[in-house]
Structures are given as C-alpha cells and as structure tokens.
Amino acid sequence: MQGVMSKYQINAPAKINLFLHVVGKSTSGYHVLESVFAFIKLYDTLEIEIGSKNRGVEFVQFSGISKHDNTVQRAIGHLVRRCAPGVAKNVYVKVTKNIPVSAGLAGGSADAAAIIRLLGKNWGISEAGMNGVAASVGSDVPVCLQSRTAFVCGMGENVKLLPHARLPNYVVLVRPNDVYLSTRSVFDAYACKEFSKSIGNPPEASDGLLSLVMQSRNDLTDTAILLVPEVKKILAELQSLGGCILSRMSGSGATCFALFEDGEAASDGVRYLKGRHPEWWVYETEISQ
C-alpha cells in the first residue's frame, strides 16, 4: 500500500575538473585517476514523487537518454535492494536537463547523487550505504554525493573534501554545439607511454591548491582533441580572454572552462565568445564555494 504521496524538487549541480591526472591502471583494466573536483552553479532539476501511482524516470529538454537504462534508474534500483522490507515505495522522477550530456560535467552522476541523497534519507539508508550505492552507479557519483570541492583518487571511491579551498569564483564554460563525447570513447582512445606521477595529498590552503592546479593539467586533453579537434581552438580562445586565470578541459570533454577572479571580465568574455562563435554553447556561472 503506497499511502500518502510526497513531492520534492531538488537541484543537481555540475562539476568541473580543475585538473585530471591518469596515474596508473588497475588490475581490472580501469584507469586510476587523481583530480580536484569543483562544483558550479549549473543544475539539473529533479521533481520527485515518492509513493506515486506512477514509477519511472522522464527526461525533459533532452530526448537522447533511455528512460529504462540511466543513472537515476540504476540508483533507485540499488537503493530499493538496500531498504528494509516494506520501506521502499514507487518513485517517479522528472529530470529537467540543463547540464549538457556527454560533456565532461557529470550531469548523469549529479542526477544519480541527488536521488541517492533524497531517497537514502527518506528510506533510512546509512551514509555508508548511500556511499556504496553511489560507487555502484558510477565513478563520479561518490564525489557528486558531496557536491563540494574535493580531491578524488583511485577510480572515484576515495574522496577527500577540501573545505578551506578558495578558488577564482567566476567560470565560463564552452563546448561545441551538438558534440557528444562519451567517457568510454576517450578512455578507449587514450594511450600514453608514461603515467603521471601521483601528487599524494593536495595542499589544503587555498594558495597552495591554486598553485597546484596551475601547474597541473588534464591528461585526457590530447586524446579529446584527436576526437574533437575543436577543443584545441576553444582552449586557445578561452586563454586569450582578458582576465582569464586558467583555461582547461573538464573531465573527458568536450566542455572547456576558464576561471576568472573578476565577474565583469568573465561577462565580457562571454559576450565576445557568443558574438564570435555562434556554433559554440557558452555559459557563464560561478563556483559553489
């Protein structure tokens, strides 16, 4: 018996990778990474009905995601299996997609993390249980469960929050319109003669962290450029903007970003890019500190 239906609306924030190093490969064949994640004020919105007559997941503003095989549906399935008998109820979710898909911004992982947080609390699942579900759904989901600046290593299972991190606040995002670059395609094409050296623990002080970020890189950039040559042009255009502190690709691409200390400089850059490159998606946002 479903009983009273509860309705919720929650936001799922996108992430950017301030750096991403490939430091090895596991015995299971997966690449071992080190990265600093920061979350930004670009959100998918999830409308959730718990105890609904309906069940399932619907996506709005993007039609290319399967209703039956997606990160939200997988997260719900894992949560149901961890519930005490009789606790789980029908769940209906409508996801309004504002985060570009297959773009290196972890939109699908963010959506899964949002539903894990909400249903986990409603259904009495422990923090450890929610973390276990997150790791089962995808490598970016554990850090998205926190949605705060963090150092992530391994295959996404090791998350160290960086509460004292203070980063340039303003962000300009750019990606080629209608280009979808899957994580799998980039890693399948990735080949290196030598892995990056592990950095160990990142500095917690904000000055040290920014210095580390500036000296680091995204090891997947060259591979992404082979698949989407436009990425190289985007990075050069971002770096040329007045006030740009850093330009870099996020995740496996194809979205790139620039960081600014000055909001007016970021806005000027957005106006310039939109006027010069109508073929690009350009978005101005901020880091969630």
Swiss-Prot record:
InterPro entries referenced in this protein's UniProt entry, alphabetically: GHMP_kinase_C_dom, GHMP_kinase_C_sf, GHMP_kinase_N_dom, IspE, Ribosomal_Su5_D2-typ_SF, Ribsml_uS5_D2-typ_fold_subgr
State the SUPFAM superfamilies in the record: GHMP Kinase, C-terminal domain, Ribosomal protein S5 domain 2-like
Q: What is its EC number?
A: 2.7.1.148
Q: Which residues form the active site?
A: 15, 140
Q: Which Pfam families match?
A: GHMP_kinases_C (PF08544), GHMP_kinases_N (PF00288)
Q: Where does ATP bind?
A: 100-110
Does the record's keyword annotation contain ATP-binding?
yes
Keywords from UniProt, A to Z, are: ATP-binding, Isoprene biosynthesis, Kinase, Nucleotide-binding, Transferase
Cite a single GO BP annotation: isopentenyl diphosphate biosynthetic process, methylerythritol 4-phosphate pathway
Question: Which GO molecular function terms does the record list?
Answer: 4-(cytidine 5'-diphospho)-2-C-methyl-D-erythritol kinase activity; ATP binding
Give the pathway listed in the UniProt entry for this protein. Answer: Isoprenoid biosynthesis; isopentenyl diphosphate biosynthesis via DXP pathway; isopentenyl diphosphate from 1-deoxy-D-xylulose 5-phosphate: step 3/6
Under catalytic activity, the entry for this protein gives: 4-CDP-2-C-methyl-D-erythritol + ATP = 4-CDP-2-C-methyl-D-erythritol 2-phosphate + ADP + H(+)
> In UniProt terms, what function does this protein have?
Catalyzes the phosphorylation of the position 2 hydroxy group of 4-diphosphocytidyl-2C-methyl-D-erythritol.
NCBIfam families per UniProt: ispE, PRK14608.1
The similarity annotation says: Belongs to the GHMP kinase family. IspE subfamily.
- Could you identify this protein by its name? 4-diphosphocytidyl-2-C-methyl-D-erythritol kinase
As recorded in Swiss-Prot or TrEMBL, the protein's gene is named: ispE
